Amino acid sequence: MQYQSECLSALKSVVNIHKPFEKTFMDAMKLFMAIPDRINFLQLGRYGRFSEQTYRNLFEHETFDWFAFNGSIISKHLTGKRKAIAIDPSYIPKSGKKTPWIGYFWSGCAGEYKRGLEIMGIGVIDIDNHECMTLGSIQTPDCKTLDNMDKNLVDWYSSYLISRKDKIQSISRTVVADAFFSKETFITPMCENDFHVISRFRNDVILYYPTLEQKTGKRGHPKWFDGRIDFANLDLTRCKEYEVNKGKLYGLRVYAKALKRYVSLAIWYPMDGRTDKWQLYFSTDDSMDGREVLDYYRTRFQLEFCFRDGKQHAGITNCQSTDFRKLDFHFNASLAAVNLAKAACKRLGIAYSISSCKSFIHNAYMLERFICVFGINPDMQVIDKLFKELILFTARAA
C-alpha cells in the first residue's frame, strides 16, 4: 500500500528509532486512516494489532521528531520553486478540568472565544502549485501559564518559531501569517533572527510614502517621508499596477509606523459590490514584488484545509487523554496522516481527496483482516483480481 510505504520511508529519516517503536508507529498511522469513526485509544485497541495500552505507551514518546518525519514527505512531494512557512492557530474542542493548558481560545468557525485547547500549526506552502503540508504543531499555553512565563501570546508564538529556526530556515526564511501577527512585537524578533514575514495590515493602518527628495548637501537630514498614504486617493505615480482577474492590484515600498520599518505593500481594490474598500498585504522584505506578496498570502489558506481534513477525517479532535505528551503526539500524528494521504495520492497519480483516500485504506484494511482471520489458504489469483474493485467500492458509491 502506497500510504504505508510513504510512512516507512519518512520514518527512516528520523534518527534513534528502534524496531518495536517502528512496528507500533506504522500500525497506528495506518489506523488514523483505516478507522471510520472516532480515533482514540479504545478504537486503536479494537482495530489494531496491539493492545490499547501499547498505543498509550506509544503516544508518550515526546522526543519523536515530527519535523524530520514530515520534512521527509515534504521534500519529495512539494516540488515548486517558491516555498514558505505558513503558521496558523486552530481551536480544538476539549472539556474537563485536568486537561493541561485548557482555557478559552478564539474559534474562527464560531466567531467567539470558546473553552478548549489551541494548537499552532506550522506548514510548508508551495506557492507555484497551491499546496500545503504540515511540518508540525505545538499546543498553545493558556493564560495562566503565559503569565507564569511572563509572556503574552504573541511573544510565545515568536519565541517558539525562533527556537526551531534551524529546521524551519532550512526550508524557507519566509513566514506567512494572518493579520493577528502583524504586530511589532512579533515582526521585530522574527526579522532579527533572519526571517521575513508576510502578513496583512488593518485598513486604517498608518503608512507613509518614502521621500523622493534628493540630498542637497546642506546641514540637517532631508525629510524621511512625503506624507501619509490616503488609500481612497492613492498616488498612482508611485505605484506599480498588476493585472489581476478581479479588482485592481498596486504595489509600492512604504514606511510602516507601527512596525518601524520599510515594507513592500500590495494594495488590492476589489470589484464593485464588495463591502470592503481595500485590502493591504505586506512583506518585511521591501524588495519583494507586490504580486508575489499577494500570491504568498493567499496560498496561506491551504494550511487551513489541512486542519479541516484533520478534524473531519483524521480525528484530530478525538484524543481523550489528559497527558500533555499524548495530546501532542495525537495532534501531530493526525496532521501527519493527512500528509501521508496526500503523498500516497501523488504517488498513485490521482487527484487528492481525503474522503476517498480514507475509504480506500479502510476497505483495504478490512479485506486484509478478513483474509487473515479466515485461517484458510487464500487463492491469490482471485484476490489480486478483485482487490482493487473491492477497495474502490465505497469511493465509487460516494
Language model features: what each stretch is:
Residues A28, A34, K277-F301:
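Extended, non-catalytic structural segments that build the interaction scaffolds
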Residues L8, S13-K97, K223-W224, R228, ...:
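Electropositive nucleic-acid engagement tracts
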Residues L58-T134, K248-R253:
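Active-site-proximal, Lys/Arg-enriched surface segment
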Residues T54-N57, G108-I168, V263-L280:
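Electropositive, glycine- and tryptophan-enriched low-complexity nucleic-acid-binding patches
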